[in-house]
Amino acid sequence: MYNCVIIIWYELFESNIGGFWRKMMNADVKKSFLVNGNAFSDIKRIIGIVSGKGGVGKSTVTCALARRLASMGYKVGIMDADITGPSIPRMMGIAERCEENDKGIVPPCSAEGIKIISMNLLLKNEDDAVIWRGPVIANWVKQFYTDVYWGELDFLLVDMPPGTGDVPLTVFQSLPIDGIVLVTSPQSLVSMIVKKAYNMAANGGSDERSYRRNS
């Protein structure tokens, strides 16, 4: 399992650790990449769940956080942005497929009332392989935001694939992210990535951050 989780509100450290691509684009150019959400959805906060490598418990953290927020009375949704390796539906006990109406794609709900969209819920068989190149995958991630009827949500958690490839880049460029959760494991190399992010946030003067170490 992971041994630490860092939560940093994105809007407070955007100028400091927003990613390598922000250094090459000004604010106006960045805004031009943002896509409009579903016209019938009202999402108050979008939180990205990220990790430097796979197998550190990122999706487990996503599900646990979603369940905790739901238990507190918040309306929660999960976007499984790991298009080629989706795991959220099975972890949340979802087997039914998505439906569609005049408002968009309707995501199924878990037993806790958490709305979930995932490529597995759109495939005919969940075991079917998704063999697509980066641009196609990135486009699907955007469609999960623009074409899905989320309704009213307090939190939309975006479970991303590990690393800094096409999907995380697309999410940070195209969606109005409010915060991120960085998930790491006991290995020193992985923990180093998160510690660097934490130190950068601290140097940037961010007050809304937390560090948790599990024994």
Go through the PLM ranges and name each one.
Residues 56-64, 85-89, 160-168, 189-193:
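Short glycine/serine/threonine-rich phosphate/pyrophosphate-binding segments
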Residues 43, 54, 80, 88, ...:
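Residue-level signature of catalytic and energy-coupling elements of molecular machines
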Residues 29, 154-155, 161-215:
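Conserved catalytic-core segment of NTP-binding enzymes
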